[in-house]
């Protein structure tokens, strides 16, 4: 019978030499004093470099602005959470009782952070070239389909440009609620937009993410 650890490693396309590193990468702050946040910090930087390097060589005639937007699309929390679900990481996360009860194994922010932590763990367990190969294998289809252009602009930028094009006032964002403990907060942001009857509400694990979520909803309403 295949063990859970082996199933996960097959999904990741990487066999760990250190089972302790793999376990640490899956351990949320709520579960243990020794958790994956340092690995997450490391993995975030490695991921950004690997994706930037690939885009630089993949698009030799694209300017810095478009490359930055493509990289942001590929390394954002939403994309990382999608990867986490593809790996079925929710089945392997080590969470405290509170996070388990609140469905933390489904939360985008926790899945995204875990993917970054796994990247950090693979780097420490192997080397730069090996972690590069793993990341590029995860991102192969996304890298083959991504293209420079307006679709890579974040929702706040697109909303601002949409309103400017219609000669309307810029949106106003207000934080209306912050819920949860310091390491696991949820922000609620209200976005007031000229042309919409009611403010739109966005939620996210940071103020910026909540604002982006609200802007995305506002765009959908303006375009409908």
From Swiss-Prot:
Gene3D superfamilies linked to this entry: 3.30.160.20, Ribonuclease III domain
GO CC terms: cytoplasm
Main location group: cytoplasm
Active-site residues, record numbering mapped to chain: 44, 116
Pfam families the record matches: dsrm, Ribonucleas_3_3
SUPFAM superfamilies listed in its UniProt record: dsRNA-binding domain-like, RNase III domain-like
RNase III domain residues: 5-127
InterPro entries: dsRBD_dom, RNase_III, RNase_III_dom, RNase_III_sf
Domain DRBM as annotated: residue spans: 154-224
UniProt-listed GO biological process terms: mRNA processing; regulation of gene expression; rRNA processing; tRNA processing
Enzyme class (EC, first level): hydrolase
Binding residues for Mg(2+): 40, 113, 116
Domain of life where this protein originates: Bacteria
Localization annotation: Cytoplasm
PROSITE patterns: DS_RBD, RNASE_3_1, RNASE_3_2
Alphabetized GO MF terms: double-stranded RNA binding; metal ion binding; ribonuclease III activity; rRNA binding
EC annotation from Swiss-Prot or TrEMBL: 3.1.26.3
Catalytic activity: Endonucleolytic cleavage to 5'-phosphomonoester
Keyword field: Cytoplasm, Endonuclease, Hydrolase, Magnesium, Metal-binding, mRNA processing, Nuclease, RNA-binding, rRNA processing, rRNA-binding, tRNA processing
Cofactor annotation: Mg(2+)
PANTHER family reported in the protein's UniProt record: RIBONUCLEASE 3, RIBONUCLEASE III
Function: Digests double-stranded RNA. Involved in the processing of primary rRNA transcript to yield the immediate precursors to the large and small rRNAs (23S and 16S). Processes some mRNAs, and tRNAs when they are encoded in the rRNA operon. Processes pre-crRNA and tracrRNA of type II CRISPR loci if present in the organism.
Similarity comment: Belongs to the ribonuclease III family.
UniProt-recorded name of the protein: Ribonuclease 3
Organism: Photobacterium profundum (strain SS9)
